[in-house]
UniProtKB/Swiss-Prot annotation:
<feature type="topological domain" description="Lumenal">
    <location>
        <begin position="44"/>
        <end position="330"/>
    </location>
</feature>
<feature type="topological domain" description="Cytoplasmic">
    <location>
        <begin position="1"/>
        <end position="22"/>
    </location>
</feature>
<dbReference type="GO" id="GO:0047237">
    <property type="term" value="F:glucuronylgalactosylproteoglycan 4-beta-N-acetylgalactosaminyltransferase activity"/>
</dbReference>
<keyword id="KW-0472">Membrane</keyword>
<keyword id="KW-1133">Transmembrane helix</keyword>
<dbReference type="InterPro" id="IPR052427">
    <property type="entry name" value="Glycosyltrans_GT2/GT47"/>
</dbReference>
<keyword id="KW-0964">Secreted</keyword>
<keyword id="KW-0325">Glycoprotein</keyword>
<feature type="binding site">
    <location>
        <position position="293"/>
    </location>
    <ligand>
        <name>UDP-N-acetyl-alpha-D-glucosamine</name>
    </ligand>
</feature>
<dbReference type="GO" id="GO:0035248">
    <property type="term" value="F:alpha-1,4-N-acetylgalactosaminyltransferase activity"/>
</dbReference>
<comment type="pathway">
    <text>Glycan metabolism; heparan sulfate biosynthesis.</text>
</comment>
<feature type="binding site">
    <location>
        <position position="71"/>
    </location>
    <ligand>
        <name>UDP-N-acetyl-alpha-D-galactosamine</name>
    </ligand>
</feature>
<feature type="binding site">
    <location>
        <position position="151"/>
    </location>
    <ligand>
        <name>UDP-N-acetyl-alpha-D-galactosamine</name>
    </ligand>
</feature>
<feature type="binding site">
    <location>
        <position position="244"/>
    </location>
    <ligand>
        <name>UDP-N-acetyl-alpha-D-galactosamine</name>
    </ligand>
</feature>
<feature type="binding site">
    <location>
        <position position="152"/>
    </location>
    <ligand>
        <name>Mn(2+)</name>
    </ligand>
</feature>
<dbReference type="InterPro" id="IPR029044">
    <property type="entry name" value="Nucleotide-diphossugar_trans"/>
</dbReference>
<feature type="active site">
    <location>
        <position position="245"/>
    </location>
</feature>
Length: 330
């Protein structure tokens, strides 16, 4: 019995040696793998973010996302605040900033230094300060939907998410938050008017015939359609530095043969103009603003030889009110 017990010892010793050898081999392989990994080029955080963004965007159709276009002039502080706010909006694919500060470098380096950012922001330096610069066919535009926002307007994320869902149901119309109307007179001259929500019980509410593009969604195909308009339309906008939004309503109404836009009642939309340090005020403050826009309406009627704008009283709200029946001006 003692002899048999002694005979089993060499086998156990051999097993221990094999185990030790295996551990040594595994350790060497791990060290080699670590060394090879160290030799590989490092992947920066911003590159990884870009890669994840590309993979994410590839999984979405062009109807599931939109591009924000924002034209700006002399409001860098406010611009950075707005860009930071809109970064968190779901379904936002890209931001295009139309930089109208001629002779001044766009703040792309400053913006990038505050990153990384989940949504890419592209600054488009312009050679002339024109109102219609924002209506170019940008090669970076890859989505069907455009969200156009003025550089002093902050729209809440819930409002944008809801309005985008409405636009997906009506992709041939402007879907936005600021309605306006044209008013005809007995002399046949048109004037530009605001939109007043009326008190309940006073009818189905006021009517609008335009939805301003400075806080709206619309189809990117209309940017190309705008470029094909008569030269007189472009000249009117350049001469007045105004009315590109009125022209877009004319163009779309004429193209689709119905009301150009759908009014979505905003819950939380603010004008931040007073928060900028530049001291620059929007053109709507000018005394001649309303007269100039009335002039544009009549001029466009002459150019197109018709009045394509049509009235609507439909208001779509997150809270289910079907008509514009609240007494206040928008």
């Amino acid at each position: 019995m003692r002899c048999c017990h002694i005979c089993k010892l060499p086998g156990r010793v051999m097993g221990i040696r094999v185990l030790r050898l295996s551990l040594v081999v595994i350790l060497v392989l791990l060290l080699v793998a670590g060394a090879l990994t160290a030799l590989l080029p490092s992947v920066k955080e911003d590159k990884m973010l870009m890669l994840r963004r590309e993979i994410k965007s590839q999984g979405k159709s062009t109807m599931d996302s939109f591009t924000l276009i924002m034209q700006t002039y002399n409001r860098t502080d406010l611009l950075l605040k707005l860009l930071n706010h809109y970064q968190a909006v779901p379904n936002l694919h890209k931001v295009i900033v139309v930089w109208n500060n001629i002779g001044e470098k766009a703040p792309d380096e400053l913006w990038n230094s505050l990153g990384p950012h989940p949504i890419p922001v592209i600054f488009k330096q312009q050679t002339a300060n024109r109102m219609r610069n924002r209506l170019q066919v940008f090669p970076e535009l890859e989505t069907n939907a455009v969200l156009m926002v003025d550089d002093d307007t902050l729209i809440s994320t819930p409002d944008l998410v809801f309005a985008f869902s409405v636009w997906q149901q009506f992709p041939d119309q402007i879907v936005g938050f600021v309605p306006r109307k044209h008013v005809s007179t007995s002399s046949g001259i048109y004037s530009y008017g605001s939109f007043e929500m009326q008190a309940p019980g006073s009818g189905n509410g006021d009517q609008y015939s335009m939805v301003l593009i400075g806080a709206s969604f619309f189809n990117s195909k209309y940017l190309e359609l705008f470029q094909r308009q008569p030269a007189a339309v472009h000249a009117l906008i350049d001469d007045t530095q105004n009315c590109d939004d009125i022209a877009m309503n004319f163009i779309i109404a004429k193209h689709i043969g119905k009301t150009s836009g759908i009014f979505v009642k905003p819950v939380n939309m603010d004008n931040l103009e007073k928060e900028t340090n530049s001291g620059y005020s929007g053109m709507w403050h000018r005394a001649e603003h309303a007269l100039q826009r009335s002039y544009c309406i009549n001029k466009l009627v002459n150019i197109y030889d018709s009045m394509p704008l049509r009235y609507s009283n439909i208001m779509i709200s997150q809270f289910g009110f079907p008509y514009a029946n609240y007494k206040r001006k928008i």
